[in-house]
Amino acid sequence: LTRLGLNIHMTHNNINTEEVNCFGQDVKFELAAPNLWWVHNTFDDDTLKWMQSIYVNLDNKFEVTRPERRLLLADGADNRTLQEIGRMLVPSLEKMLDLKLNLMISKFWLDLPYFGCQPHGDSSEIIVTLQIYVDVKHIEDHQLRMYGAEFMHVDPLIEAPIIENCGYLNLNTDQKIHQVTWGCGTRQSVTFQYNLATDN
């Protein structure tokens, strides 16, 4: 995959970010199951640090979403940058998946303690979802730890790596059932959802 750059100068919480990039040079995709990949080392350090600062930037606002205990970044400068990053990822994803894609939406989620999500399948309109955990605060190896998305279309189910700068890429043509088990801690993630481009 090629590295795509998005040159933006931003100031947030007295931290200057000269450049926010898309996929970092060390990104790795590991096939976990049919049409599902674990993603490792997704973004470079500057981009990751910027993403980790979103929830402490006092210029940002969050909305309460359903299910409860999940906050969604509302519109603003950081949200607009996130949308642009989602668009800049398209060429690499198209090359990997051999599909023509259109960004539907980019999201930043802050999951609070005891957030969980019941088994569900994504809308058939969503063809590709890329979710990356940018920060996780919990006690590892504890029964009440935070969990990554758990995909239930294989037996036993498999869990996306709940590690900073890692996550999953889901080709949703088979509408996999997945869930999030609740735990104690907080979890920040960015999610990019794509549908098929109209010229497909």
Predicted features and spans:
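Short, Lys/Arg-enriched N-terminal segments with co-localized hydrophobic residues
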Residues: 1-9
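General helical structural elements
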Residues: 7, 73-74, 191
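Intrinsically disordered, low-complexity cationic segments
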Residues: 8-11, 119
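Non-heme Fe(II)/2-oxoglutarate
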Residues: 12-97
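Catalytic core of non-heme Fe(II) oxygenases with the double-stranded beta-helix
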Residues: 92-200
